UniProtKB/Swiss-Prot annotation:
GO terms for cellular component: cytosol. SMART domains: THUMP (SM00981). The active site is at 456 (cysteine persulfide intermediate). This is tRNA sulfurtransferase.
Length: 482
Protein backbone atom coordinates (compact mmCIF):
# COMPACT_ATOMS: atom_id res chain seq x y z
CA UNK A 1 0.00 0.00 0.00
CA UNK A 2 1.10 3.55 -0.62
CA UNK A 3 0.14 6.92 0.82
CA UNK A 4 1.13 10.36 -0.44
CA UNK A 5 1.35 12.95 2.34
CA UNK A 6 0.58 16.52 1.31
CA UNK A 7 2.14 19.27 3.38
CA UNK A 8 0.29 21.95 5.33
CA UNK A 9 0.25 24.99 2.96
CA UNK A 10 2.11 27.27 5.40
CA UNK A 11 5.08 24.91 5.18
CA UNK A 12 5.25 25.30 1.41
CA UNK A 13 5.67 29.11 1.58
CA UNK A 14 8.70 28.95 3.88
CA UNK A 15 12.20 29.64 2.63
CA UNK A 16 14.00 26.68 1.08
CA UNK A 17 16.11 25.93 4.17
CA UNK A 18 13.16 26.21 6.58
CA UNK A 19 10.91 24.14 4.32
CA UNK A 20 13.50 21.38 4.08
CA UNK A 21 13.93 21.39 7.86
CA UNK A 22 10.18 21.15 8.42
CA UNK A 23 9.85 18.30 5.90
CA UNK A 24 12.74 16.43 7.51
CA UNK A 25 11.18 16.77 10.97
CA UNK A 26 7.74 15.71 9.69
CA UNK A 27 9.29 12.66 8.02
CA UNK A 28 10.88 11.66 11.32
CA UNK A 29 7.61 12.20 13.19
CA UNK A 30 5.75 9.97 10.73
CA UNK A 31 8.35 7.22 11.17
CA UNK A 32 8.15 7.45 14.96
CA UNK A 33 4.36 7.11 14.95
CA UNK A 34 4.00 4.42 12.28
CA UNK A 35 6.80 2.09 13.38
CA UNK A 36 4.39 0.67 15.97
CA UNK A 37 2.16 -0.57 13.14
CA UNK A 38 4.70 -1.85 10.62
CA UNK A 39 8.44 -1.86 11.30
CA UNK A 40 9.20 -2.53 7.63
CA UNK A 41 7.42 0.53 6.24
CA UNK A 42 9.34 3.13 4.24
CA UNK A 43 8.93 6.89 4.62
CA UNK A 44 10.53 8.91 1.82
CA UNK A 45 10.55 12.69 1.69
CA UNK A 46 10.31 14.77 -1.47
CA UNK A 47 10.18 18.53 -2.07
CA UNK A 48 6.38 18.79 -2.06
CA UNK A 49 5.19 15.56 -0.46
CA UNK A 50 6.16 12.60 1.67
CA UNK A 51 5.67 9.03 0.51
CA UNK A 52 4.71 6.20 2.87
CA UNK A 53 4.94 2.59 1.69
CA UNK A 54 3.91 -0.35 3.85
CA UNK A 55 3.50 -4.08 3.28
CA UNK A 56 1.11 -5.17 6.03
CA UNK A 57 -2.36 -4.79 4.49
CA UNK A 58 -3.96 -5.60 7.84
CA UNK A 59 -2.66 -2.28 9.16
CA UNK A 60 -4.03 -0.14 6.31
CA UNK A 61 -6.85 1.49 8.30
CA UNK A 62 -4.70 1.98 11.42
CA UNK A 63 -1.90 3.63 9.43
CA UNK A 64 -4.32 5.86 7.57
CA UNK A 65 -6.01 6.92 10.79
CA UNK A 66 -2.68 7.65 12.48
CA UNK A 67 -1.58 9.84 9.57
CA UNK A 68 -4.70 12.01 9.88
CA UNK A 69 -3.65 12.90 13.45
CA UNK A 70 -0.01 13.91 12.88
CA UNK A 71 0.50 17.71 12.94
CA UNK A 72 1.94 19.15 9.73
CA UNK A 73 -0.13 17.04 7.32
CA UNK A 74 -2.76 18.80 5.22
CA UNK A 75 -4.24 15.68 3.62
CA UNK A 76 -3.39 12.10 2.77
CA UNK A 77 -3.89 10.41 -0.58
CA UNK A 78 -4.22 6.63 -0.63
CA UNK A 79 -2.91 5.68 -4.05
CA UNK A 80 -2.13 2.85 -6.39
CA UNK A 81 1.15 3.51 -8.20
CA UNK A 82 1.32 1.95 -11.69
CA UNK A 83 3.35 2.56 -14.87
CA UNK A 84 1.63 3.83 -18.03
CA UNK A 85 2.50 4.19 -21.73
CA UNK A 86 0.10 6.80 -23.11
CA UNK A 87 -3.19 8.62 -22.46
CA UNK A 88 -5.26 5.65 -23.55
CA UNK A 89 -3.42 3.46 -21.07
CA UNK A 90 -4.23 6.03 -18.36
CA UNK A 91 -7.90 5.85 -19.33
CA UNK A 92 -7.99 2.05 -19.23
CA UNK A 93 -6.44 1.94 -15.78
CA UNK A 94 -8.82 4.64 -14.52
CA UNK A 95 -11.80 2.71 -15.91
CA UNK A 96 -10.85 -0.42 -13.96
CA UNK A 97 -10.30 1.57 -10.76
CA UNK A 98 -13.35 3.85 -10.84
CA UNK A 99 -16.09 2.02 -12.77
CA UNK A 100 -18.00 0.84 -9.70
CA UNK A 101 -17.76 4.24 -7.98
CA UNK A 102 -19.14 6.08 -11.02
CA UNK A 103 -22.19 3.91 -11.72
CA UNK A 104 -25.24 6.20 -11.62
CA UNK A 105 -23.15 9.20 -10.52
CA UNK A 106 -22.12 12.57 -11.89
CA UNK A 107 -18.35 12.99 -12.09
CA UNK A 108 -15.40 15.00 -13.30
CA UNK A 109 -11.72 14.21 -13.75
CA UNK A 110 -8.95 16.28 -12.17
CA UNK A 111 -5.30 15.67 -13.09
CA UNK A 112 -2.00 16.91 -11.69
CA UNK A 113 1.06 16.34 -13.85
CA UNK A 114 4.81 16.55 -13.25
CA UNK A 115 7.55 15.75 -15.75
CA UNK A 116 7.91 15.98 -19.53
CA UNK A 117 4.99 14.68 -21.60
CA UNK A 118 3.49 15.36 -25.03
CA UNK A 119 0.14 16.14 -23.38
CA UNK A 120 -1.14 18.58 -20.77
CA UNK A 121 -3.16 17.97 -17.61
CA UNK A 122 -6.28 19.27 -19.38
CA UNK A 123 -5.69 16.87 -22.29
CA UNK A 124 -5.72 13.94 -19.85
CA UNK A 125 -8.82 15.24 -18.06
CA UNK A 126 -10.73 15.49 -21.35
CA UNK A 127 -9.55 12.16 -22.73
CA UNK A 128 -10.14 10.14 -19.56
CA UNK A 129 -13.39 11.96 -18.75
CA UNK A 130 -14.75 11.37 -22.25
CA UNK A 131 -13.75 7.72 -22.17
CA UNK A 132 -15.35 7.10 -18.79
CA UNK A 133 -18.52 8.86 -19.94
CA UNK A 134 -18.74 6.62 -23.02
CA UNK A 135 -17.99 3.34 -21.26
CA UNK A 136 -20.16 3.84 -18.15
CA UNK A 137 -23.65 4.47 -19.48
CA UNK A 138 -25.21 5.50 -16.17
CA UNK A 139 -22.45 8.02 -15.38
CA UNK A 140 -22.65 11.65 -16.44
CA UNK A 141 -20.01 14.37 -16.62
CA UNK A 142 -20.62 17.39 -14.38
CA UNK A 143 -17.73 19.82 -13.97
CA UNK A 144 -19.30 21.80 -11.11
CA UNK A 145 -20.07 20.04 -7.81
CA UNK A 146 -19.99 16.47 -9.15
CA UNK A 147 -20.87 13.57 -6.88
CA UNK A 148 -17.50 11.92 -7.57
CA UNK A 149 -14.19 13.53 -8.49
CA UNK A 150 -11.69 11.22 -10.18
CA UNK A 151 -8.26 12.35 -8.98
CA UNK A 152 -5.23 11.30 -11.02
CA UNK A 153 -1.58 12.28 -10.72
CA UNK A 154 0.93 11.76 -13.51
CA UNK A 155 4.63 11.89 -12.65
CA UNK A 156 7.09 11.02 -15.42
CA UNK A 157 6.09 7.46 -16.47
CA UNK A 158 4.08 6.69 -13.32
CA UNK A 159 0.35 7.05 -12.77
CA UNK A 160 -1.09 7.53 -9.32
CA UNK A 161 -4.65 6.30 -9.12
CA UNK A 162 -6.04 8.05 -6.07
CA UNK A 163 -8.27 5.64 -4.15
CA UNK A 164 -9.16 8.07 -1.37
CA UNK A 165 -8.38 11.46 0.12
CA UNK A 166 -8.34 11.96 3.89
CA UNK A 167 -7.95 15.29 5.65
CA UNK A 168 -5.18 15.81 8.19
CA UNK A 169 -5.18 18.23 11.11
CA UNK A 170 -2.77 20.66 9.42
CA UNK A 171 -0.44 22.84 11.46
CA UNK A 172 3.33 22.52 11.84
CA UNK A 173 5.23 19.30 12.63
CA UNK A 174 5.93 18.81 16.33
CA UNK A 175 9.52 19.79 17.01
CA UNK A 176 9.65 22.71 14.58
CA UNK A 177 8.85 25.07 17.46
CA UNK A 178 10.22 25.10 20.99
CA UNK A 179 8.83 23.15 23.95
CA UNK A 180 5.98 24.46 26.09
CA UNK A 181 4.51 23.44 29.46
CA UNK A 182 0.73 23.17 29.59
CA UNK A 183 -1.03 23.79 32.90
CA UNK A 184 -3.56 21.01 32.54
CA UNK A 185 -6.59 20.55 34.77
CA UNK A 186 -8.43 17.97 32.66
CA UNK A 187 -11.26 20.36 31.80
CA UNK A 188 -12.41 21.60 28.42
CA UNK A 189 -10.06 24.57 28.19
CA UNK A 190 -6.67 23.11 29.09
CA UNK A 191 -7.14 20.07 26.84
CA UNK A 192 -8.02 22.19 23.82
CA UNK A 193 -5.22 24.70 24.43
CA UNK A 194 -2.70 21.83 24.70
CA UNK A 195 -3.91 20.41 21.39
CA UNK A 196 -3.66 23.81 19.70
CA UNK A 197 0.00 24.20 20.67
CA UNK A 198 0.77 20.65 19.52
CA UNK A 199 -0.86 21.48 16.22
CA UNK A 200 1.33 24.57 15.99
CA UNK A 201 4.50 22.49 16.19
CA UNK A 202 5.33 22.53 19.92
CA UNK A 203 6.22 19.56 22.02
CA UNK A 204 3.75 19.97 24.89
CA UNK A 205 4.72 18.84 28.38
CA UNK A 206 2.08 18.75 31.11
CA UNK A 207 2.03 20.29 34.58
CA UNK A 208 -0.84 19.28 36.85
CA UNK A 209 -1.68 20.94 40.16
CA UNK A 210 -3.44 18.33 42.27
CA UNK A 211 -6.15 19.87 44.42
CA UNK A 212 -8.42 16.85 44.71
CA UNK A 213 -6.48 13.74 45.67
CA UNK A 214 -5.56 10.59 43.74
CA UNK A 215 -8.84 10.34 41.83
CA UNK A 216 -8.34 13.83 40.39
CA UNK A 217 -4.81 12.99 39.25
CA UNK A 218 -5.97 9.75 37.65
CA UNK A 219 -8.53 11.66 35.59
CA UNK A 220 -6.02 14.26 34.42
CA UNK A 221 -3.48 11.57 33.58
CA UNK A 222 -6.09 10.04 31.29
CA UNK A 223 -6.56 13.33 29.45
CA UNK A 224 -2.83 14.01 29.09
CA UNK A 225 -2.10 10.46 27.95
CA UNK A 226 -4.99 10.60 25.48
CA UNK A 227 -3.78 13.90 23.96
CA UNK A 228 -0.21 12.67 23.71
CA UNK A 229 -1.15 9.27 22.32
CA UNK A 230 -3.54 10.72 19.77
CA UNK A 231 -1.66 13.77 18.51
CA UNK A 232 1.86 13.89 19.93
CA UNK A 233 3.23 10.36 20.29
CA UNK A 234 6.11 11.12 17.93
CA UNK A 235 7.92 12.73 20.88
CA UNK A 236 8.65 11.96 24.51
CA UNK A 237 7.05 14.40 26.93
CA UNK A 238 6.89 14.90 30.69
CA UNK A 239 3.89 14.75 32.99
CA UNK A 240 4.67 16.71 36.15
CA UNK A 241 2.23 16.40 39.06
CA UNK A 242 2.47 18.87 41.94
CA UNK A 243 0.53 18.26 45.16
CA UNK A 244 -0.97 21.74 45.62
CA UNK A 245 -3.17 20.92 48.60
CA UNK A 246 -0.65 22.43 51.10
CA UNK A 247 -0.60 25.65 49.05
CA UNK A 248 -4.40 25.80 48.96
CA UNK A 249 -4.51 25.16 52.70
CA UNK A 250 -2.12 28.05 53.34
CA UNK A 251 -4.20 30.34 51.11
CA UNK A 252 -7.46 29.38 52.81
CA UNK A 253 -5.94 29.96 56.22
CA UNK A 254 -4.14 33.26 55.65
CA UNK A 255 -5.45 35.07 52.55
CA UNK A 256 -8.45 37.40 52.32
CA UNK A 257 -11.41 35.71 50.61
CA UNK A 258 -11.70 38.13 47.69
CA UNK A 259 -8.03 37.78 46.71
CA UNK A 260 -7.80 33.99 46.92
CA UNK A 261 -8.51 33.18 43.27
CA UNK A 262 -5.90 35.54 41.82
CA UNK A 263 -3.29 34.55 44.40
CA UNK A 264 -3.87 30.84 43.74
CA UNK A 265 -3.28 31.43 40.01
CA UNK A 266 -0.16 33.48 40.81
CA UNK A 267 1.15 30.60 42.90
CA UNK A 268 0.47 28.18 40.07
CA UNK A 269 2.36 30.37 37.60
CA UNK A 270 5.28 30.70 40.02
CA UNK A 271 5.43 26.93 40.47
CA UNK A 272 5.04 26.17 36.76
CA UNK A 273 7.75 28.70 35.91
CA UNK A 274 10.15 26.90 38.25
CA UNK A 275 9.32 23.60 36.54
CA UNK A 276 9.75 25.17 33.10
CA UNK A 277 13.13 26.63 34.07
CA UNK A 278 14.24 23.27 35.47
CA UNK A 279 13.57 21.52 32.16
CA UNK A 280 14.50 24.31 29.74
CA UNK A 281 10.94 24.95 28.56
CA UNK A 282 10.34 28.34 26.94
CA UNK A 283 6.68 29.09 27.67
CA UNK A 284 3.63 28.15 29.71
CA UNK A 285 0.26 27.36 28.14
CA UNK A 286 -3.07 27.93 29.86
CA UNK A 287 -6.69 27.52 28.79
CA UNK A 288 -7.77 30.93 30.03
CA UNK A 289 -10.37 32.86 28.02
CA UNK A 290 -11.02 36.54 28.56
CA UNK A 291 -13.82 37.15 31.06
CA UNK A 292 -14.76 33.50 31.46
CA UNK A 293 -14.27 33.57 35.25
CA UNK A 294 -13.29 36.22 37.77
CA UNK A 295 -9.55 35.55 37.57
CA UNK A 296 -9.59 35.96 33.78
CA UNK A 297 -10.30 39.67 33.47
CA UNK A 298 -7.57 41.74 31.84
CA UNK A 299 -6.60 43.32 35.15
CA UNK A 300 -6.29 39.97 36.90
CA UNK A 301 -4.50 38.27 34.02
CA UNK A 302 -1.93 41.07 34.03
CA UNK A 303 -1.36 40.61 37.75
CA UNK A 304 -1.02 36.86 37.26
CA UNK A 305 1.55 37.38 34.48
CA UNK A 306 3.60 39.77 36.61
CA UNK A 307 4.89 37.04 38.93
CA UNK A 308 7.00 35.37 36.24
CA UNK A 309 9.33 36.27 33.39
CA UNK A 310 8.26 33.11 31.56
CA UNK A 311 6.10 33.72 28.51
CA UNK A 312 2.47 32.68 29.06
CA UNK A 313 0.52 31.62 25.96
CA UNK A 314 -3.28 31.69 26.00
CA UNK A 315 -4.50 30.28 22.66
CA UNK A 316 -8.17 30.43 23.77
CA UNK A 317 -8.13 34.03 24.98
CA UNK A 318 -10.84 35.21 22.56
CA UNK A 319 -12.87 31.98 22.39
CA UNK A 320 -16.31 31.56 23.91
CA UNK A 321 -17.22 28.42 25.84
CA UNK A 322 -19.39 26.93 23.11
CA UNK A 323 -16.53 27.14 20.63
CA UNK A 324 -14.14 25.54 23.12
CA UNK A 325 -16.56 22.68 23.83
CA UNK A 326 -17.03 22.08 20.10
CA UNK A 327 -13.25 21.83 19.68
CA UNK A 328 -13.05 19.45 22.65
CA UNK A 329 -15.69 17.30 20.98
CA UNK A 330 -13.71 17.25 17.71
CA UNK A 331 -10.46 16.16 19.34
CA UNK A 332 -12.13 13.66 21.68
CA UNK A 333 -11.60 15.25 25.11
CA UNK A 334 -15.21 16.32 25.73
CA UNK A 335 -16.18 13.14 27.58
CA UNK A 336 -13.18 13.44 29.91
CA UNK A 337 -13.87 17.10 30.64
CA UNK A 338 -17.56 16.67 31.44
CA UNK A 339 -16.80 14.51 34.46
CA UNK A 340 -13.67 16.34 35.62
CA UNK A 341 -14.13 18.31 38.88
CA UNK A 342 -13.15 21.99 38.85
CA UNK A 343 -11.54 22.96 42.14
CA UNK A 344 -10.15 26.43 41.45
CA UNK A 345 -13.57 27.98 40.97
CA UNK A 346 -14.81 27.14 44.47
CA UNK A 347 -11.86 28.45 46.46
CA UNK A 348 -13.40 31.92 46.95
CA UNK A 349 -16.99 32.91 47.68
CA UNK A 350 -16.69 36.51 46.48
CA UNK A 351 -13.67 36.79 44.15
CA UNK A 352 -12.49 40.16 42.91
CA UNK A 353 -12.68 40.86 39.18
CA UNK A 354 -10.32 43.82 39.40
CA UNK A 355 -7.57 43.03 41.86
CA UNK A 356 -5.26 45.78 43.08
CA UNK A 357 -1.56 44.99 42.92
CA UNK A 358 -0.72 46.53 46.31
CA UNK A 359 -3.48 44.52 48.02
CA UNK A 360 -2.42 41.30 46.35
CA UNK A 361 1.19 41.81 47.35
CA UNK A 362 0.16 42.70 50.91
CA UNK A 363 -1.86 39.48 51.17
CA UNK A 364 1.00 37.43 49.74
CA UNK A 365 3.30 38.70 52.49
CA UNK A 366 1.25 36.51 54.84
CA UNK A 367 2.00 33.43 52.72
CA UNK A 368 4.78 31.03 53.69
CA UNK A 369 6.63 30.63 50.39
CA UNK A 370 8.66 27.72 51.74
CA UNK A 371 5.49 25.66 51.25
CA UNK A 372 5.47 26.54 47.55
CA UNK A 373 9.17 25.72 47.21
CA UNK A 374 8.64 22.38 48.92
CA UNK A 375 5.75 21.20 46.73
CA UNK A 376 7.72 22.12 43.59
CA UNK A 377 10.78 20.30 44.90
CA UNK A 378 8.67 17.20 45.60
CA UNK A 379 6.87 17.30 42.23
CA UNK A 380 6.43 13.90 40.60
CA UNK A 381 7.90 13.88 37.09
CA UNK A 382 7.22 10.91 34.79
CA UNK A 383 7.66 10.15 31.12
CA UNK A 384 4.11 10.16 29.79
CA UNK A 385 4.79 6.82 28.10
CA UNK A 386 5.22 5.32 31.56
CA UNK A 387 1.76 6.36 32.73
CA UNK A 388 0.27 3.06 31.60
CA UNK A 389 3.04 1.06 33.30
CA UNK A 390 2.82 3.21 36.42
CA UNK A 391 -0.91 2.61 36.52
CA UNK A 392 -0.26 -1.14 36.37
CA UNK A 393 1.91 -0.84 39.49
CA UNK A 394 -0.62 1.34 41.30
CA UNK A 395 -3.48 -1.04 40.64
CA UNK A 396 -1.57 -4.15 41.57
CA UNK A 397 -4.34 -4.83 44.11
CA UNK A 398 -6.87 -4.85 41.24
CA UNK A 399 -6.82 -8.32 39.74
CA UNK A 400 -6.33 -8.67 35.99
CA UNK A 401 -8.05 -11.71 34.48
CA UNK A 402 -8.19 -13.31 31.04
CA UNK A 403 -11.20 -15.52 31.76
CA UNK A 404 -14.48 -15.27 33.63
CA UNK A 405 -16.68 -17.06 36.14
CA UNK A 406 -20.45 -17.57 36.50
CA UNK A 407 -20.92 -14.39 38.56
CA UNK A 408 -18.85 -12.16 36.27
CA UNK A 409 -20.10 -9.51 33.84
CA UNK A 410 -17.89 -7.68 31.34
CA UNK A 411 -18.25 -3.90 31.54
CA UNK A 412 -17.33 -2.24 28.24
CA UNK A 413 -16.14 1.24 29.29
CA UNK A 414 -15.22 2.58 25.84
CA UNK A 415 -16.93 5.70 24.50
CA UNK A 416 -20.26 5.26 22.73
CA UNK A 417 -18.68 5.93 19.31
CA UNK A 418 -16.03 3.25 19.84
CA UNK A 419 -18.65 0.75 20.96
CA UNK A 420 -20.79 1.42 17.91
CA UNK A 421 -17.80 1.09 15.56
CA UNK A 422 -16.55 -2.18 17.10
CA UNK A 423 -19.20 -3.83 19.30
CA UNK A 424 -17.82 -6.24 21.90
CA UNK A 425 -19.28 -9.74 21.88
CA UNK A 426 -17.88 -12.48 24.11
CA UNK A 427 -19.45 -15.91 24.04
CA UNK A 428 -20.62 -17.25 27.39
CA UNK A 429 -20.81 -14.00 29.34
CA UNK A 430 -22.99 -10.90 29.44
CA UNK A 431 -21.49 -7.64 28.21
CA UNK A 432 -22.83 -4.39 29.65
CA UNK A 433 -22.04 -0.96 28.22
CA UNK A 434 -21.15 1.94 30.54
CA UNK A 435 -18.79 4.58 29.07
CA UNK A 436 -15.88 5.51 31.34
CA UNK A 437 -17.13 9.07 31.82
CA UNK A 438 -20.31 7.75 33.47
CA UNK A 439 -18.61 5.37 35.90
CA UNK A 440 -18.32 7.93 38.69
CA UNK A 441 -22.08 8.53 38.76
CA UNK A 442 -23.61 5.33 37.37
CA UNK A 443 -21.46 2.42 38.57
CA UNK A 444 -23.25 2.36 41.92
CA UNK A 445 -26.54 1.71 40.11
CA UNK A 446 -25.26 -1.61 38.75
CA UNK A 447 -25.93 -4.95 40.46
CA UNK A 448 -23.27 -4.95 43.18
CA UNK A 449 -23.69 -8.68 43.76
CA UNK A 450 -21.87 -9.21 40.46
CA UNK A 451 -18.15 -9.01 39.77
CA UNK A 452 -17.52 -6.44 37.04
CA UNK A 453 -14.69 -7.02 34.59
CA UNK A 454 -13.70 -3.63 33.17
CA UNK A 455 -12.61 -3.75 29.54
CA UNK A 456 -11.24 -1.28 27.01
CA UNK A 457 -9.25 -1.92 23.87
CA UNK A 458 -5.76 -1.07 25.12
CA UNK A 459 -6.25 -1.70 28.81
CA UNK A 460 -4.99 1.70 29.99
CA UNK A 461 -8.39 3.23 30.69
CA UNK A 462 -9.73 0.09 32.37
CA UNK A 463 -6.78 0.02 34.80
CA UNK A 464 -7.15 3.72 35.63
CA UNK A 465 -10.87 3.38 36.19
CA UNK A 466 -10.42 0.24 38.28
CA UNK A 467 -8.13 2.19 40.60
CA UNK A 468 -10.67 5.00 40.80
CA UNK A 469 -13.54 2.63 41.66
CA UNK A 470 -11.40 0.89 44.28
CA UNK A 471 -10.75 4.24 45.91
CA UNK A 472 -14.50 4.84 45.96
CA UNK A 473 -14.96 1.61 47.92
CA UNK A 474 -16.05 -0.74 45.12
CA UNK A 475 -14.14 -3.99 45.61
CA UNK A 476 -16.09 -6.01 43.04
CA UNK A 477 -14.04 -4.82 40.05
CA UNK A 478 -11.34 -6.52 38.02
CA UNK A 479 -9.54 -5.69 34.78
CA UNK A 480 -10.40 -7.96 31.84
CA UNK A 481 -7.50 -8.59 29.41
CA UNK A 482 -8.24 -11.69 27.29
Amino acid sequence: MKFIIKLFPEITIKSQSVRLRFIKILTGNIRNVLKHYDETLAVVRHWDNIEVRAKDENQRLAIRDALTRIPGIHHILEVEDVPFTDMHDIFEKALVQYRDQLEGKTFCVRVKRRGKHDFSSIDVERYVGGGLNQHIESARVKLTNPEVTVHLEVEDDRLLLIKGRYEGIGGFPIGTQEDVLSLISGGFDSGVSSYMLMRRGCRVHYCFFNLGGAAHEIGVRQVAHYLWNRFGSSHRVRFVAINFEPVVGEILEKIDDGQMGVILKRMMVRAASKVAERYGVQALVTGEALGQVSSQTLTNLRLIDNVSDTLILRPLISYDKEHIINLARQIGTEDFARTMPEYCGVISKSPTVKAVKSKIEAEEEKFDFSILDKVVEEANNVDIREIAQQTEQEVVEVETVNGFGPNDVILDIRSIDEQEDKPLKVEGIDVVSLPFYKLSTKFGDLDQSKTWLLWCERGVMSRLQALYLREQGFNNVKVYRP
